C-alpha cells in the first residue's frame, strides 16, 4: 500500500520513543511505501481535489540519518491507500483547519486515519473522560482554588497543560505544596486557560494504557 503520513518535520523526531516512527518502520517492513508531508502542505482549490506537497521516503535503519527523502511533489490525497494524521499537539487553529481539509479529502474518497472529525471532537488530554475506569483521580479546571483543594485531598499531584505532549510543561507537586501557586499561574496563564490535575500514581513506572 501507499501510505501518507502527515507529521511534524522529520528532523524533529526522537526515533527512540516516537510512535509515528515505529509505525513507519513496521509499515516499511511489511512492504508498504511511505510518503510524508506537513499539515501546512495541504492544499485545496475549487474544481480540484485536496492535494499535498509530499516527499517519498525510505527508512535507512541508521539511528542518525534515519531516512532518505525524494524531492517534493504534488499528489492528491486520494492517490494514497491511507492517509495518517500524526501531527503532534498543540491543537491550534492551523491543526483545526487541517482537519477540515482532511474531511474534504474524505468526501473525495481518501481514507484518513484517525477520522478528522474524531480528532476535533476528542482532544488528546480530554478524551480520557470517556474512560474513567482507566484513570486515577483527575481534575480539569482553570480555578486555582479548585487546584488547591485537590492538592489538599491528594497531596502528591501532577499538573499538565491540555495542549502539551511528550512530557512538556508537566509539574509534580508533593505534600509540601512547594511552588503550587506559581506553577498554577504558569499553566493556567493567570486564569485564562484550563489545566489538568491528577493524583500522582507510583504505578506509572510500570507503564500506562493506550486506547487505539
Predicted regions and their residues:
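Extreme N-terminal starter segment of soluble prokaryotic enzymes
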Residues: 1-4
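Short acidic, glycine-rich loop/turn motifs
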Residues: 61, 161-163
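Structural detector of well-ordered beta-strand residues that form the stable sheet scaffold
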Residues: 35, 112-113, 158, 196-198
Amino acid at each position: 500500500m501507499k501510505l501518507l503520513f502527515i507529521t511534524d518535520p522529520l528532523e524533529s523526531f526522537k526515533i527512540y520513543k516516537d510512535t509515528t516512527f515505529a509505525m513507519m518502520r513496521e509499515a516499511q517492513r511489511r512492504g508498504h511505501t511511505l510518503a510524508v508531508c506537513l499539515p501546512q502542505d495541504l492544499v485545496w482549490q475549487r474544481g480540484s481535489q485536496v492535494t499535498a506537497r509530499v516527499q517519498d521516503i525510505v527508512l535507512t535503519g541508521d539511528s542518525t540519518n534515519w531516512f532518505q527523502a525524494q524531492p517534493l511533489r504534488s499528489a492528491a490525497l486520494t492517490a494514497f491507500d491511507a492517509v495518517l494524521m500524526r501531527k503532534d499537539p498543540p491543537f491550534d487553529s492551523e491543526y483545526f483547519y487541517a482537519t477540515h481539509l482532511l474531511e474534504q479529502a474524505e468526501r473525495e474518497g481518501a481514507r484518513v486515519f484517525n477520522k478528522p472529525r474524531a480528532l476535533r471532537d476528542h482532544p488528546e488530554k480530554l478524551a480520557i473522560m470517556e474512560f474513567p475506569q482507566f484513570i486515577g483521580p483527575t481534575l480539569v479546571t482553570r480555578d486555582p482554588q479548585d487546584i488547591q483543594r485537590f492538592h489538599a485531598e491528594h497531596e502528591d499531584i501532577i499538573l499538565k497543560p491540555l495542549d502539551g505532549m511528550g512530557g512538556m510543561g508537566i509539574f509534580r507537586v508533593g505534600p509540601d505544596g512547594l511552588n503550587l501557586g506559581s506553577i498554577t499561574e504558569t499553566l493556567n496563564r493567570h486564569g485564562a486557560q484550563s489545566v489538568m490535575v491528577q493524583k500522582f500514581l507510583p504505578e506509572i513506572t510500570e507503564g500506562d494504557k493506550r486506547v487505539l
